[in-house]
A protein has these predicted regions:
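A well-structured
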Residues: 1-278
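Long, K/E/R/D-enriched contiguous segments that form extended
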Residues: 261-290, 363, 420-422, 427
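Inter-helical turn/loop segments and adjacent helix faces that build the functional surface
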Residues: 230-231, 254, 258, 298-301, ...
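Post-HExxH zinc-binding segment in Zn-dependent metallohydrolases
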Residues: 242-243, 368, 379-407, 416, ...
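Active-site recognition of the HExxH zinc-binding catalytic motif
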Residues: 342-368, 389-390, 394, 432, ...
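Glycine- and acidic
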Residues: 122-123, 179-188, 228-234, 269-280, ...
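C-terminal, non-catalytic "cap/extension" segments appended to globular domains
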Residues: 110, 115-117, 227, 354, ...
């Protein structure tokens, strides 16, 4: 069914909550392990219509944040979502209280029961009002960001549409683009500062209600991190600061030499090549045709997947006024249909987001069609889900010539370099959030000072050159995740460590790398992060020394593939 034909009906929340009570009673009373497993499948199906309606509303709202109807529907889910989540938690509580609960682990693997324990520990009726308030705060942030229109080049442009200007070979044009963006954020400075203060206060209050010290502690439960905690994440960040940052300084020196920009400032960083960055082929249909060819040749599974996505018009990827920034993949369970949202702006990032979100969507497509995988275990925790997307970016490389033509080698260098360099920024975002939630009384200026310290620690090559907004340390405010889904961002770093390993493997044997990837993807949400890495024969980045070897191999590859 085409996306435009999918019908939306606002769900009956009271009926759903009553159904949840029945399911909780069934879970509590299941007389043996087999019965408990069947109830688990049943409860997992029970949320399909609600989840589909919720995601349809969110898709339509993010496609046009100015549409009053979809804004009202989004508000409805913001207000009612916490009650549904908590009803789901009560079902989990009933499963955990059943004496046959171990049957779920035996049948589904390690993540099922551990995930329910995290759900129970992370949610409570006492936090419903606070959750509703948090949802409303996020919607306010999305409206500020999604409503951004700035004046440049005689045009009114959205933030994503500034992308090509930020990559212009004329430094004055780049500076003007960054200043236009900075002007918008500076104009909303007080609102953004106040919103973040409220978000930190709200989430820390939720944590205290649930018996945690602060939200940095609760976030590990809410993010469903299984088998590791703050100590392991800090050990990983320490390895990045110690073993990756020195390698990245070599990489940035290579970039400066390549571009001929002797003393690059922040607005020079998007320039990767002297004669301009790689540009994908123009035209929506041309790109979609190239993607279809690429996925048809990659594997039979991806061929079936891309036909389904394109034939059912499950992409909205072109930027326009009122559309929310960023990109995402979501799922419409009643239709077994993934959906991909993006904001193309005629930069190489258009291909990044296409292959990235297709990685998520491909995993969702397979999991939704596996009868052994319950709906709520179709997707693993986010640090694992991002492996699907980030590895896909690399594993499609043999077909990138279809999307880049003569710029293919430049894109290969740019993509590998950007993915490697990203580790430093991702760790800075994560450490920043730990500091914010552990020190909630910091003033806005103190928050910005902490951000600038982390920039020096993780990205010592950056010179902001008195750029408004960024120069005062407020650049973190344009990172959607910091407001919308705190502590998510490190997941990109953990998955990057897996994706870089898939990249290095694919250089030796692409077929072997793809088969390992497919094996990992097919485990859906039935395995933890470390188990998934072991499934594919990859190194676990928490282990001392695991990061250094990968970093050195990446630097060597980049040294050998300098072009432009």
């Amino acid at each position: 069914m085409k996306f435009s034909e999918m019908t939306y009906t606002r769900p009956d929340i009271d009926a759903l909550l009553a159904r949840c009570k029945q399911l909780a009673a069934k879970a509590a009373d299941a007389p043996d392990g087999d019965a408990l497993i069947q109830v688990y499948y049943e409860q997992s199906r029970a949320f399909a219509d609600y989840a589909t309606a919720s995601q349809l509303a969110n898709i339509h709202y993010t496609c046009d944040t100015r549409d009053a109807y979809w804004k009202a529907e989004q508000d409805f889910f913001d207000a009612n979502g916490p009650a549904v989540t908590n009803a789901s938690v009560e079902i989990s509580r009933a499963f955990l209280a059943n004496p046959y609960v171990d049957a779920l682990t035996e049948h589904f693997g390690t993540t099922c029961v551990a995930g329910m324990k995290n759900a129970v520990l992370g949610m409570d009726d006492r936090t419903v009002e606070l959750q509703q308030e948090f949802n409303a705060l996020v919607s306010q942030y999305q409206q500020i960001y999604g409503g951004a229109l700035v004046e440049l080049d005689g045009k009114q442009l959205t933030i994503p549409q500034l992308g090509p200007y930020k990559e212009d070979l004329d430094p004055a044009v780049r500076r003007a683009a960054y200043e236009a963006e900075a002007g918008y954020f500076d104009a909303h400075r007080d609102e953004l500062d106040a919103l973040y203060t409220k978000i930190v206060k709200n989430l820390n209050q939720q944590a205290k209600v649930l018996g945690y010290k602060d939200y940095s502690e609760l976030s590990y439960v809410r993010m469903n991190r299984i088998g590791y905690g703050q100590a392991e994440i800090q050990a990983f960040r320490d390895q990045v600061a110690r073993d990756v940052v020195p390698e990245l300084q070599k990489v940035m020196a290579m970039r400066a030499k390549r571009t001929g920009i002797t003393h690059p400032t922040f607005t020079d960083l998007p320039i990767i090549f002297k004669d301009g960055n790689p540009k994908p082929i123009p035209g929506y249909q041309a790109r979609m045709d190239a993607a279809r060819t690429m996925y048809h040749e990659l594997s039979p599974e991806t061929a079936e997947f891309i036909d389904f996505m394109q034939d059912n018009e499950l992409f909205d990827v072109e930027s326009r006024p009122g559309k929310m920034s960023g990109g995402y993949m979501t799922s419409l369970p009643s239709y077994k249909a993934p959906f991909i949202f993006a904001n193309w702006n005629n930069t190489s990032g258009d291909v990044d987001v296409l292959t990235h979100e297709c990685g998520h969507a491909f995993e969702g497509y397979l999991a939704e069609r596996d009868p052994n995988v319950p709906a709520d275990l179709e997707c693993p925790a986010m640090e694992s889900a991002e492996i699907h997307s980030m590895a896909m970016e690399f594993l499609t490389a043999p077909w990138h010539h279809l999307l880049f033509g003569k710029d293919t080698e430049k894109y290969a260098l740019l993509h590998a370099e950007d993915s490697f360099v990203f580790l430093a920024y991702g760790c800075a975002v994560d450490e920043f959030q730990h500091i914010m939630y552990q020190n909630p009384d910091l003033t806005p200026d103190q928050r910005n000072a902490e951000w600038l310290k982390l920039e020096k620690k993780y990205r010592p090559w950056i010179d902001f050159d008195n750029l408004p907004f960024y120069g005062r340390g407020a650049g973190w405010q344009r990172q959607l995740h910091i407001y919308e889904c705190p502590f998510y961002y490190i997941d990109y770093c953990l998955s990057t460590m897996a994706a870089l390993q898939f990249f290095l493997l694919s250089l030796d044997d692409h077929k072997d790398a793809w088969e390992r990837y497919l094996k990992l993807v097919r485990r859906a949400g039935l395995a933890s992060y470390t188990e998934l890495l072991q499934t594919a024969g990859l190194k676990v980045p928490f282990e001392e020394g695991s990061v250094k070897g990968i970093a050195q191999q990446m630097t060597r590859w980049l040294e050998e593939h300098q072009v432009g």
